[in-house]
Amino acid sequence: MSESNFIQKVGAACNKKEDLYQKSKTRYAVRSIFAGGFLTLSTAVGAVAADLLNTFVPGSGRFLFPFIFAWGLVYLLFLNAELTTSNMMYLTAGTYLKKIHWKKALEILLYCTFFNLIGALIVAFLFNQTTAFAHVDPKGFLATVAENKLQRSNQVVFFEGVIANIFVNIAILSYLYFKDETAKVLLALSAIYMFVFMTNEHLAANFASFSLLSFNSVSSQLPHFEFLNILRHYSVTFFANWVGGGVLIGLAYAWLNNIKSLYND
């Protein structure tokens, strides 16, 4: 009996990632930069749109922002960018299935994470040179969401992060399994919309929102927007996202499919 579709796709993904990383770390870095950049693009536009909509119907921006943000994930999926939180699923599953050594998987994951942040910082800097970000309101959508996130305890951040990356990797698995392009887009949008609407903690999404604020003078008006607090938040979110996407989705699906059975993915 041949390997399941899931195992074949995870193996191919791990081989592709490791091959590019070994042959050209610069090119792998650029693909990772694109992922952070794409999410920052959609975050910035979503935040501006949410503030505008809130002026007409207070509170309604929370419904619009997740929809616009979710397109950033669609871009990176179709344009082959490297996202840390989806790599948590691929590389954890690949390690369990012996498609990649755990040391190499961890190295690639950390490398990808760093350059996701670099991509977010680059696009955030560019946006902060535009008129749309010339007068960011400390009571506006982006600043309010960021400040609320940075007030959370480690325990709350952890559970929010676990849930976020379950949603994200539901989107990734849907993208892997479905052949119809429209179905891929709709399923990805639905899963991403849900975690963003719930303001769950997603590392790359936080890279985007915190970076946009870091280049803006409004950050000085946010009491919890401090370097060490942001670093704490990133660290807890990274681990939580790995548990949600890497263990509860990646490892679970790898285990489910690591058997000779008619019932596999």
Residue ranges with predicted function:
Residues M1-D265:
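Alpha-helical transmembrane segments and their helix-helix packing motifs
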